[in-house]
Amino acid sequence: MRVGVLAVQGAFIEHEKILQNLGVECLELRNGKDARQDVEGLILPGGESTTQGKLLRELDMFEPLREKIVAGLPVLATCAGLILLAEELANDSARYFATLPVRVKRNAYGRQLGSFYTEEQFGDLGKVPMTFIRAPYIESVGEGVEILAKVKGDIVGVRYKNQIGLSFHPELNGDRRIHQMFLDSISDGKSAPCKQKAV
């Protein structure tokens, strides 16, 4: 199995280490040629979403990756990656891939709680460690979106067809269960194409 990892900015190395420990080949995606390579899954890591969005376009990666996501390529998106997938951003006109029917608020926890750690229930996996770093959260979800996790009432994890979006960083805690769930969804072929929306 080969998974593409967006590697233009952000915490991509940590994702790669977990995937490699799970026996998965990683392809770092750094330019348009990389973005057009065949992969069986895609990781959109944390980082700075505005910078990532700008680089995706400048490096000719935006359209080929968006086409893959729309066609049903399984995606695991964390923190900034969630922002890239979101159809709508609160108090922000910016839009990126816009393939995940959720409304996301950037830096939702403010400066005092900009970074924190907790353990909460995640789908059927039980309690998992969650590290939040200047994290967004999901204000609302559209039809067909499964809520996987909440922290103090705020939605921090969702699944929609081929896309898993997380507010937190599962790659920073050494717990492999979420990555394994993502890989299992690839192996099981559970992902499905998402509806095309105009950008």
Swiss-Prot record:
Active site: C79 (nucleophile), H169 (charge relay system), E171 (charge relay system)
Top-level division of the source organism's lineage: Bacteria
GO cellular component: cytosol; glutaminase complex
Signal peptide: none
The protein, known as: Pyridoxal 5'-phosphate synthase subunit PdxT
Binding site for L-glutamine: G47, E48, S49, R106, I133, R134
EC id: 4.3.3.6, 3.5.1.2
GO biological process terms, semicolon-separated: glutamine catabolic process; pyridoxal phosphate biosynthetic process; pyridoxine metabolic process
Transmembrane helix found in the keyword field: no
Species assigned in the record: Desulfitobacterium hafniense (strain Y51)
Purpose of the protein: Catalyzes the hydrolysis of glutamine to glutamate and ammonia as part of the biosynthesis of pyridoxal 5'-phosphate. The resulting ammonia molecule is channeled to the active site of PdxS.
Catalysed conversion reaction: aldehydo-D-ribose 5-phosphate + D-glyceraldehyde 3-phosphate + L-glutamine = pyridoxal 5'-phosphate + L-glutamate + phosphate + 3 H2O + H(+); L-glutamine + H2O = L-glutamate + NH4(+)
Pfam families hit by this protein: SNO (PF01174)
Keywords: Glutamine amidotransferase, Hydrolase, Lyase, Pyridoxal phosphate
Phylogenetic classification of the source organism: Bacteria, Bacillati, Bacillota, Clostridia, Eubacteriales
Pathway connected to this protein: Cofactor biosynthesis; pyridoxal 5'-phosphate biosynthesis
